[in-house]
């Protein structure tokens, strides 16, 4: 029934040090743990063992390039849509360099697709089902000739981008939408 949560974690290969650096691994795993709680999973895959499993996956695969890591925790079995368990989990990793758009920036449009409201689905959880919302916005942006979409909430305020956070720098200070703007926390 789409009851799953995930994280997207970057690992950056440093050729000079011949070492892979995982970006904020503990923070990401704490968020996947929080997402499980928000989604009311009956059992929780804790952050610590997920961190350990991720480090072990990196060690066994011996990556010598930057990677994208995706841990996922899901409700397993054929229960009712209101089932809270049991859970299953897996972690995937693929080599993935830094996209050129990180350096060049993107052309974005304000989408006609509204960001899901925390009143209808828990937008603050990193749930796979929630990402269909930004998928529609992203498809619209590409069809209209843009690279990405910026989504507004039901109050017409900037919420987030298509699968990304939105912020501006004003006088050296980062300004983001508030946590009450239906953002991913």
Predicted regions and their residues:
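Short, acidic/charged, Gly/Pro-enriched secondary-structure junctions
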Residues: 50-77, 94
């Amino acid at each position: 029934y789409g009851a799953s949560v995930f994280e997207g974690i970057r690992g950056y290969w440093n050729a000079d040090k011949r070492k892979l650096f995982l970006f904020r691994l503990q923070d990401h795993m704490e968020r996947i743990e929080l997402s499980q709680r928000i989604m009311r999973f009956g059992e929780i895959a804790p952050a610590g063992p997920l961190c350990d499993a991720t480090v072990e996956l990196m060690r066994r695969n011996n990556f010598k390039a930057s990677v994208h890591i995706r841990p996922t925790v899901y409700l397993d079995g054929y229960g009712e849509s209101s089932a809270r368990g049991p859970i299953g989990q897996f972690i995937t990793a693929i080599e993935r360099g830094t996209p050129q758009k990180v350096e060049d920036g993107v052309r974005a449009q304000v989408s006609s697709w509204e960001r899901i409201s925390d009143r209808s689905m828990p937008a603050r959880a990193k749930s796979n089902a929630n990402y269909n919302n930004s998928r529609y916005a992203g498809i619209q942006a590409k069809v209209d000739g843009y690279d990405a979409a910026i989504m507004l909430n039901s109050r017409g305020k900037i919420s987030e981008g298509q699968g990304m956070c939105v912020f501006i720098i004003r006088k050296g200070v980062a300004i983001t939408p508030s946590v009450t703007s239906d953002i991913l926390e």
